[in-house]
């Protein structure tokens, strides 16, 4: 459970999401020894994967300072060095005037931002999600929620990025297989 949650958090950070996480299962990310000024978070990930995430800055947002300015140490299940030098280069997409209002396929989603699938480290994303992402094309949405086009009120409008997603969804944190132009006419 903890590994799955940390993997989802890491993937969210891979696409630029900033999830607020205080406690993941039995791992309190803010558990800091006040006398020594250090804490240890054992993710249970392999050293290679963990080092790769750290080298790419993908866990930086999880390691926030406590009131005394201390940052917990993060450890994996080994101390191997990462050999991957890939970085995340996707930028947030800006809303457009041609946002879809209905989808030919998939579901209409309101996403905080999107990134081109071709711009991500597929090996890392596949490892973190536990699915084959080799054939994913189009956009990857982050922090998405369904949009209802019928009626008014909450959920009927989107002030950020509206897309149609027909791929896997990981609790709305990450949506695969999204398109911005998949509109029914």
UniProtKB/Swiss-Prot annotation:
<keyword id="KW-0134">Cell wall</keyword>
<dbReference type="InterPro" id="IPR019778">
    <property type="entry name" value="Hydrophobin_CS"/>
</dbReference>
<protein>
    <recommendedName>
        <fullName>Class I hydrophobin SC6</fullName>
    </recommendedName>
</protein>
<keyword id="KW-0732">Signal</keyword>
<feature type="disulfide bond">
    <location>
        <begin position="103"/>
        <end position="164"/>
    </location>
</feature>
<comment type="subunit">
    <text>Self-assembles to form functional amyloid fibrils called rodlets. Self-assembly into fibrillar rodlets occurs spontaneously at hydrophobic:hydrophilic interfaces and the rodlets further associate laterally to form amphipathic monolayers.</text>
</comment>
<dbReference type="GO" id="GO:0005199">
    <property type="term" value="F:structural constituent of cell wall"/>
</dbReference>
<dbReference type="InterPro" id="IPR001338">
    <property type="entry name" value="Hydrophobin"/>
</dbReference>
<dbReference type="GO" id="GO:0009277">
    <property type="term" value="C:fungal-type cell wall"/>
</dbReference>
<feature type="compositionally biased region" description="Low complexity">
    <location>
        <begin position="75"/>
        <end position="93"/>
    </location>
</feature>
<feature type="signal peptide">
    <location>
        <begin position="1"/>
        <end position="17"/>
    </location>
</feature>
<feature type="disulfide bond">
    <location>
        <begin position="111"/>
        <end position="144"/>
    </location>
</feature>
<dbReference type="GO" id="GO:0005576">
    <property type="term" value="C:extracellular region"/>
</dbReference>
<keyword id="KW-1015">Disulfide bond</keyword>
<feature type="disulfide bond">
    <location>
        <begin position="165"/>
        <end position="178"/>
    </location>
</feature>
<feature type="region of interest" description="Disordered">
    <location>
        <begin position="70"/>
        <end position="104"/>
    </location>
</feature>
<dbReference type="Pfam" id="PF01185">
    <property type="entry name" value="Hydrophobin"/>
</dbReference>
<comment type="function">
    <text>Aerial growth, conidiation, and dispersal of filamentous fungi in the environment rely upon a capability of their secreting small amphipathic proteins called hydrophobins (HPBs) with low sequence identity. Class I can self-assemble into an outermost layer of rodlet bundles on aerial cell surfaces, conferring cellular hydrophobicity that supports fungal growth, development and dispersal; whereas Class II form highly ordered films at water-air interfaces through intermolecular interactions but contribute nothing to the rodlet structure.</text>
</comment>
<keyword id="KW-0964">Secreted</keyword>
<feature type="disulfide bond">
    <location>
        <begin position="110"/>
        <end position="158"/>
    </location>
</feature>
<feature type="compositionally biased region" description="Polar residues">
    <location>
        <begin position="94"/>
        <end position="104"/>
    </location>
</feature>
<comment type="similarity">
    <text>Belongs to the fungal hydrophobin family.</text>
</comment>
């Amino acid at each position: 459970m903890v590994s799955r949650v940390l993997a989802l958090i890491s993937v969210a950070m891979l696409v630029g999401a900033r999830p607020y996480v205080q406690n993941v299962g039995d791992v309190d990310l803010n558990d800091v020894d006040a006398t020594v000024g250090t804490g240890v978070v054992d993710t249970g990930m392999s050293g290679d994967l963990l080092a790769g995430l750290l080298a790419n800055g993908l866990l930086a947002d999880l390691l926030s300072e406590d009131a005394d300015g201390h940052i917990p140490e993060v450890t994996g299940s080994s101390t191997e060095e990462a050999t991957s030098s890939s970085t995340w280069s996707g930028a947030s997409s800006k809303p457009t005037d041609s946002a879809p209002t209905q989808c030919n396929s998939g579901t209409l989603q309101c996403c905080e931002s999107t990134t081109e699938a071709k711009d991500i480290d597929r090996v890392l994303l596949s490892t973190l999600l536990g699915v084959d992402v080799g054939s994913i094309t189009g956009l990857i949405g982050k922090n998405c929620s369904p949009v209802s086009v019928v009626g008014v009120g909450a959920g009927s409008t989107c002030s950020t990025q509206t897309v149609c997603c027909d791929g896997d969804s990981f609790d709305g944190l990450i949506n695969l297989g999204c398109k911005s132009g998949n509109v029914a006419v």
